[in-house]
Regions:
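Structured soluble/peripheral alpha/beta segments that form catalytic or ligand/cofactor-binding pockets
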Residues: 1-389
């Protein structure tokens, strides 16, 4: 993995201190594969998540699991009239604490499966770095595992918040373009540590085998670490770019957008060596950012979701438009560190298309550096959702 030492340190980062009991960290891997029999291309993901891991280090605690808190003596007191039934709390709400593995596919027929374990059942080696849990593992070059969830598992454990299915993967990856820092705030750190990554190997979902090829994988890896997410949650990224100016595929190009942080977004762009980085925590005079997320009609009866982003400073202007068919978006939910059955609910798609323009400011004029078509963009929009207790 030919990345900077700073990015390597970020890739290996695991929870320490207060974050172990009140926080989370995540490794997210996204890539494309081609089905061996039909040639159909699909977008896949694998995620490793640590949520409040030290709260209950010996067994996973899921916040949505039903836990009756009424004791026999409480019922006797109700019958005796010493306390009222209204004062009884019928369900105990626990703070979530676990290691979670997720894998799935985006687009038509999207689904995800998941597995949960505890910190004590997780093995983390520092040199060489390797993270292993639930029969799944990853290092700085290898990503492998298997997750199986049956329909009966979901009936018994609706708190899993996933689908049934069997997914296994055996992959190698090579990070081609890394950004060690994307956003650093008081409660959250985000890094597109593998903004452009080549994956190779196989990904099998419910018996369908997909080949993951380096030149067609359009891989992406990022890291989240902290105590809380910021909302709304917005993400766009793609390394599948084609120059509208020259018609050539841009082999060494990528862009990533992440936010929203105090009404600002972070943006990293590299178009064939022309690199621009905007970090949301920087002073408001350093750059301005504008974004919008909306629904718009397509062909009269279908809808698309539309992301627009414009960022500029004294030297550069970046304009991005991305569209994703609404029917191909997948709703995903995940628990938040604060517990109380609060979740982040995201619309996620892997078939975004659009355009990106990069301009350089020369006095009062704009010089167009690149104008490119965007394909297979990862598109996400999320909000916080609070359950009624």
């Amino acid at each position: 993995m030919a990345i900077s030492k700073k990015s390597q340190k970020v890739f290996r980062l695991i929870p320490t201190g207060a974050v172990r009991k009140n926080g989370f960290c995540a490794w997210r891997f996204f890539f494309s594969g081609v089905e061996n029999t039909t040639g159909m291309e699909r977008r896949f993901f694998v995620e490793f998540i640590m949520l409040n891991p030290a709260v209950a280090p010996d067994e996973p605690v899921l916040g949505f699991k039903n836990r009756t808190s009424i004791k026999a003596e409480d019922l006797q007191n109700v019958l005796a009239g010493t306390i009222s039934a209204q004062k009884l709390q019928s369900e105990e709400i626990a703070v979530p604490s676990y290691i979670c593995l997720k894998a799935g596919q985006l687009g038509a027929g999207a689904k995800e499966v998941c597995a949960y374990t505890s910190l004590s059942q997780t093995v983390i080696h520092s040199r060489p770095f390797e993270f292993s849990a639930c029969g799944c593992s990853f290092s700085e070059e290898v990503l492998s595992g298997r997750i199986a969830v049956s329909p009966s598992d979901l009936q018994t454990h609706p708190e899993y918040m996933c689908d049934s299915g069997i997914i296994n993967w055996d992959l190698r990856f090579d990070i081609r373009r890394d950004f060690a820092e994307g956003f650093t705030g008081k409660t959250l750190f985000w890094s597109p540590v593998g903004a452009q990554t080549a994956f190779s190997g196989t990904f099998t979902i419910d018996g369908k085998v997909y080949s993951v090829l380096p030149k067609k994988s359009f891989g992406y890896i990022d890291r989240f670490y902290g105590k809380a997410h910021d909302f709304p949650y917005v993400h766009l990224s793609s390394s599948n770019l084609t120059s509208i100016i020259s018609g050539k595929t841009l082999q060494n190009s990528v862009f990533v957008i992440q936010g929203v942080y105090n009404d600002r977004i972070s943006l990293v762009v590299n178009l064939e060596g022309s690199e621009v980085v905007f970090q949301a925590q920087k002073g408001r005079r350093s750059f301005e950012s504008h974004w919008d997320f909306s629904q718009m009609p397509e062909n009269g009866d279908q809808e698309k979701l539309h992301w627009t982003v414009s960022v500029h400073n004294s030297k550069y202007v970046v304009d991005i438009d991305v569209f994703c068919p609404a029917q191909l978006m997948f709703v995903r939910s995940a628990e938040l560190p604060e517990g109380q059955r609060h979740t982040i609910k995201k619309l996620v798609g892997g078939t975004g298309t659009g355009e990106i323009r990069l301009y350089k400011k020369i006095h009062r004029n704009l010089e167009l550096i690149e104008h490119a078509q965007i394909s297979t963009a990862l598109c996400e929009f999320g909000q916080k959702e609070e359950a009624e207790l």
